[in-house]
Amino acid sequence: MLSDIIRAVILGVVEGVTEFLPVSSTGHLLLVGRFFNLGEGDFWKTFDVLIQLGAILAILALYFAKLWRIALGMFSDPAAQRFIIGVLVAFLPAAVIGAAAGSYIKLFLFNPWVVCFSLIVGGAVLLWVDQLDLKPRHHDATTFPVLMYFYIGCAQCVAMIPGVSRSGASIVAAMLFGADKRAAAEFSFFLAIPTMVGAFVYDLYKSRADLTTDHMTIVAVGFVVSFITAIIVVKTFLGYVTRHGFQLFAWWRVVVGTLGLIALAMGR
């Protein structure tokens, strides 16, 4: 049990650090499980999804005042209504494709080779976009055009391939359609809420018969650790990308992906 608690802490830290960075939390969790013998097995695959709720609650805590104002204006404030519609429009493509093809994606694409190649390709794309001479027109994540929300949602679907990064795909799309770096990052946080809650509920329902009391204790530990870690990371991340952009994260992806391919080629 103690060794499982230690695993939960390590994986909770990995989830909290990587969930909102454009580096792919799913990819990192899969690689950590493979190369360090942590988190392998059916329960740990479910665990990886369930602890994402801790990271999502970190966003709700950090943006509580803004999200509460939007919720209060749901029936009276046109701006709040427009943003809620925008988030739902952005969420819809992933919901449809996830429901239709999620099991096939997990069966055929959830392996370390796919993760490593996706990390490298995604890093190259992120590096390219970060160096473009873009002229941002949208500086508030709650006021994007509705069609722009839809395009971002379509881009997020690519992140169903492990290693691509949900936040990375949505950030790149938002920047290409005119968002500044901070607004792009913030909308990726907001879009994560329905996306990850949906994945959490779906996996919890599928695994409900297999989760024991001991399992729930382990999940609770990972949940709390991911929550605390995500709060620290998000607050730091926004300030960093506003000043320095995404190059650090692009190279992070390339280095991790390359090292992963080398390890796999050596038979690890």
Swiss-Prot record:
Localization of this protein: Cell inner membrane
GO MF, any single term: undecaprenyl-diphosphatase activity
Bilayer topology term: Multi-pass membrane protein
EC number: 3.6.1.27
UniProt keyword list: Antibiotic resistance, Cell inner membrane, Cell membrane, Cell shape, Cell wall biogenesis/degradation, Hydrolase, Membrane, Peptidoglycan synthesis, Transmembrane, Transmembrane helix
Residue stretches spanning the membrane: 9-29, 47-67, 83-103, 107-127, 144-164, 184-204, 218-238, 246-266
InterPro entries: UppP
UniProt main location, coarse: membrane
Domain of life of the source: Bacteria
Record's catalysed reaction(s): di-trans,octa-cis-undecaprenyl diphosphate + H2O = di-trans,octa-cis-undecaprenyl phosphate + phosphate + H(+)
CC terms in the record's Gene Ontology section: plasma membrane
Keyword Ribonucleoprotein: no
GO biological process: cell wall organization; peptidoglycan biosynthetic process; regulation of cell shape; response to antibiotic
Protein task: Catalyzes the dephosphorylation of undecaprenyl diphosphate (UPP). Confers resistance to bacitracin.
NCBIfam families: PRK00281.1-2, PRK00281.1-4, undec_PP_bacA
Further remarks about this protein from its record: Bacitracin is thought to be involved in the inhibition of peptidoglycan synthesis by sequestering undecaprenyl diphosphate, thereby reducing the pool of lipid carrier available.
Family named by the database record: Belongs to the UppP family.
Name of the protein in question: Undecaprenyl-diphosphatase
Species whose genome carries this gene: Rhodopseudomonas palustris (strain HaA2)
Lineage of producing organism: Bacteria, Pseudomonadati, Pseudomonadota, Alphaproteobacteria, Hyphomicrobiales
Gene this protein is translated from: uppP
